[in-house]
């Protein structure tokens, strides 16, 4: 990309001129750019453009670990005992982020939105993906509070109820246009489907190991 190479060469020349110790990160350049400069530099300095190439940016979040009601599967490396969600080792980037933020959905989402903006992505259309094992076996109150916190994080303010949070998101600056939940066949029955529809779920993921 000639334009990208030209910009990078200019950055190097400026750094050499002012004897800077290191090249600034793309995110640092974008965060200090004016609105006009940002629009010109965004596509050139954008990291991982595939993340938002479709116009929808995916954010993966994790609930806190809960012990599976059926016991521990032989292939599961995680769990309450090691403070990692079921099916995860604790070394994955999404898991490390969740642990760092105490599994609080609102903090996880806000931090990831900040990162997306810093790297030049447009987070106005989001798809949330709840990973970390079977979400639907967790206590109902925890599920509803978790989902509401997701909408609150995107809306930028707290709503009085889950229904209010979903309604407010329809006109929010950042909108959740897709919502994915991981589950298993035994937690994908009629009552579970009704719950997911109530949460605003648009897609369900079922791991091949459970089939």
Place the predicted regions along the sequence by residue.
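Conserved SAM/AdoMet-binding glycine-rich loop
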Residues: 114-211
């Amino acid at each position: 990309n000639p334009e990208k190479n030209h910009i990078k060469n200019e950055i190097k020349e400026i750094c050499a001129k002012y004897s800077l110790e290191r090249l600034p990160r793309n995110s640092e350049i974008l965060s200090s750019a004016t609105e006009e400069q940002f629009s010109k530099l965004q596509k050139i300095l954008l990291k991982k453009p595939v993340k938002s190439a479709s116009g929808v940016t995916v954010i993966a979040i994790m609930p806190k670990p809960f012990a599976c009601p059926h016991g521990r599967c032989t292939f599961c490396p995680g769990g309450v005992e090691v403070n990692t969600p079921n099916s995860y080792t604790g070394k994955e980037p999404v898991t490390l982020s969740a642990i760092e933020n105490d599994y609080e959905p609102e903090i996880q989402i806000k931090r990831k939105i900040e990162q997306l903006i810093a790297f030049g992505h447009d987070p106005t259309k989001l798809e949330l993906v709840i990973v970390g094992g079977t979400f639907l076996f967790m206590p109902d109150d925890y599920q509803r509070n978790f989902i509401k916190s997701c909408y609150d994080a995107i809306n930028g303010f707290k709503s009085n109820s889950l229904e209010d949070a979903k309604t407010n998101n329809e006109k929010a600056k950042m909108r959740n246009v897709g919502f994915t939940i991981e589950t298993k066949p035994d937690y994908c029955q009629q009552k579970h489907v009704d719950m997911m529809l109530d949460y605003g779920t648009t897609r369900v993921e079922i791991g091949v190991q459970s089939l």
